[in-house]
Amino acid sequence: MTGLVFDVAPPGELLSVTSLMKPTRQQILQRKVDMTQETIDVSEMVSQRMGHSLHDSIERAWTEGNWQAAMRKLHYPQSIIDKIRINPPMDKPLEDGIIPIYLEQRGFKKFQDIILTGQLDFLIGSSYRDFKSTSTFSYTSGSRDESFMLQGSLYRFIFPELIKDDVMRIEFIFTDWASYRARSDKKYPQARVAHKEFKLMTLQETEFWLSSKLADIRKNAKLPQSRMVECTDKELWRNDDTFKYYSNPETAKAGGRCTKRFDKESEAVLY
């Protein structure tokens, strides 16, 4: 596996994990936009800022709070609590049995002609964890599962000495959870918090993905916008088109429920 890991940014073009995961077209065109001339809708920043505040609170709970007392309340044995170390030095070997917890660690890794950078939010032992404040739909539909897995795989690529487990875990904190839905639908999250585990790509698979992505960016960066690769439906989180039939046109105007739904327009017309 090629690439070197650095504690501080070495000379070179920085490219973040989150940026690299964006569609190629979006990534290229964003660089051509003068953001100082753009009008920002503050309301669109609410979810992002809530996510930042959540991560900040979790970090401070471990670095500034009485986490030992919190673990005792959760009935962790003192023998486990005594083995926890918060952000121990990465350049020194740990004593046998010690359980490291790393929070908000930024790393840099040289790969081909770029410097890949990412911030590791939470790691316990050798397992990567992340926390997401999101909708219940994101959890039940699995619409972002592949994105979570890819992000975790890229972080492992940057921090191979820390992230050794092949499985990562996402802790979900739902912003729209409703207890009445949990009672009536067993597929709905049964509590305001839940988790999922994802198998990470191998380091070789991740390196192949990186090489392919960078090649795609280089190729399209030379093209005029009209010839650049289009964003796929998957990248746009767009589902297949559906066609609805309403027996009463007034129901359609009011946004009511359709009489029948079709996958193809021709089927709807024939009906």
List each language-model region with its residue ranges.
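Activation of the activation-loop gatekeeper triad in protein kinase-fold domains
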Residues: F131-S135
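Amphipathic alpha-helical segments that form well-ordered structural scaffolds
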Residues: S53-A61, L154, I158, W209
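An active-site-proximal "capping" alpha-helix that borders the catalytic cofactor pocket
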Residues: E146-I163
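Acidic active-site catalytic centers that drive phospho-/nucleotidyl reactions
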Residues: D121, D130, Q151
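Metal-dependent nuclease catalytic cores that hydrolyze phosphodiester bonds in DNA/RNA
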Residues: M1-S127, Y139-E146, A178-K187
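Metal-dependent nuclease catalytic regions and adjoining charged, substrate-binding loops involved
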Residues: Q112, I158-Y271
